[in-house]
């Protein structure tokens, strides 16, 4: 599958959460035999969300592909959930200069600062690589009366529809907000800290609909426990398991949005360490482990490394500011 660059537009509401960061500690790096940077000991991949969701899957898969690209590295994953990602990102902010630390990043990197209630933005960190784009599906229980996304939208104009979201600044909330703006419907949000919790709530009948990435819900789709009403993507998926799911646009809802998946290093690291991690991730996306991650999670392999990733973030941040800057 060919990898390309892409840019997406996001929107998010205000998050009333402010977390102060502490000062960073030991860099964790060392000088190699050739005078360049090398990590010292194990590397930690921070996931700013709970276990079981798309961000957790991304962080663990990224660790695996890094290890495949460099057999001298061992990557452990550490979940720091809370505040729709704010807890993990704020912890990461406090680790400025730590060259043995990475973070599995996504849309919250841009969405949280737009809220104006956190003490960081993307410029406080070191962008390493954008790995992929991840579209989302509107999901209902198998016994739901709704057959299409258009059915849900029409119902939401006159009755209460509870919509489960994973974090109040993430992809799920964005697509529901864009759908509201496009159609005039209103959804009653119920936030959860991870895709795993969101799936459990949907299966338990606590919510009417959910927005979930294919990789988070494919097992339940294949078992028939849930149904996908539409995909918030520009075109239908090429993947056989998802090819029959119509886009929202096909149902008269002109909304598409892709959450990016990527890797950050802390701010304040050396240029040698930055280049080391860029080189490592460029090697990582050439591994079979990367291809497996893309295919198993039904992602679009659109990559951007180093300065290209910075440009991607700059462009999307400008678009976000235009939408919700006032």
Q: What do the predicted segments below correspond to?
A:
Residues 305-326:
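Extracellular/periplasmic bilobal clamshell ligand-binding domains
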Residues 23-124, 185-198, 203-208, 301-303:
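N-terminal (or domain-start) structured segment
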Residues 51-52, 107-108, 141-146, 165-170, ...:
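Short coil/turn segments
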Residues 164-168, 172-244:
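Ligand-binding pocket segment of bilobal, Venus flytrap-like solute-binding proteins
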Residues 94-100, 114-193, 197, 248, ...:
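Hinge/capping helix and adjacent helix->loop/strand transition within the periplasmic-binding protein
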Residues 216-286, 315-318:
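C-terminal lobe and pocket-closing loops
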Residues 236, 286, 291-311:
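Mature extracytoplasmic/periplasmic domains
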Residues 1-42, 326:
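Short, low-complexity disordered leader/linker segments with a strong preference
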């Amino acid at each position: 599958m060919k990898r390309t660059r892409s840019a997406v537009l996001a929107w998010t509401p205000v998050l009333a959460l402010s977390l102060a960061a502490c000062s960073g500690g030991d860099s964790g790096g060392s000088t190699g035999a050739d005078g360049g940077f090398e990590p010292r000991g194990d590397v930690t991949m921070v996931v700013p969300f709970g276990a079981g969701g798309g961000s957790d899957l991304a962080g663990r898969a990224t660790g695996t592909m890094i290890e495949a690209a460099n057999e001298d590295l061992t990557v452990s994953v550490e979940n720091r959930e809370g505040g729709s990602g704010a807890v993990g990102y704020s912890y990461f902010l406090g680790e400025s200069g730590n060259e043995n630390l990475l973070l599995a990043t996504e849309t919250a990197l841009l969405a949280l600062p737009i809220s104006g209630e956190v003490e960081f933005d993307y410029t406080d960190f070191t962008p390493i690589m954008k790995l992929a784009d991840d579209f989302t599906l509107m999901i209902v229980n198998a016994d739901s009366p709704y057959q299409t996304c258009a059915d849900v939208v029409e119902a939401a104009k006159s009755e209460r529809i509870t919509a489960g979201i994973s974090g109040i600044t993430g992809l799920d909330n964005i697509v529901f907000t864009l759908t509201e703006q496009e159609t005039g419907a209103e959804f009653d949000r119920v936030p959860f800290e991870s895709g795993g919790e969101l799936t459990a709530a949907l299966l338990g009948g606590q919510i009417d609909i959910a927005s979930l990435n294919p990789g988070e819900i494919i097992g339940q789709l294949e078992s028939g426990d849930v149904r996908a009403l539409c995909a918030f993507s520009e075109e239908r998926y090429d993947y056989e398991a998802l090819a029959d799911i119509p886009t929202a646009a096909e149902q008269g809802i002109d909304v598409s949005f892709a959450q990016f998946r990527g890797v950050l290093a802390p701010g304040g690291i050396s240029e040698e360490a930055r280049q080391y991690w860029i080189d490592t991730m460029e090697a990582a996306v050439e591994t079979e482990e990367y291809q497996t991650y893309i295919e198993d999670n039904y992602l679009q392999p659109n990559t951007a490394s180093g300065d290209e990733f910075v440009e991607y973030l700059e462009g999307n941040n400008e678009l976000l500011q235009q939408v919700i800057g006032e």
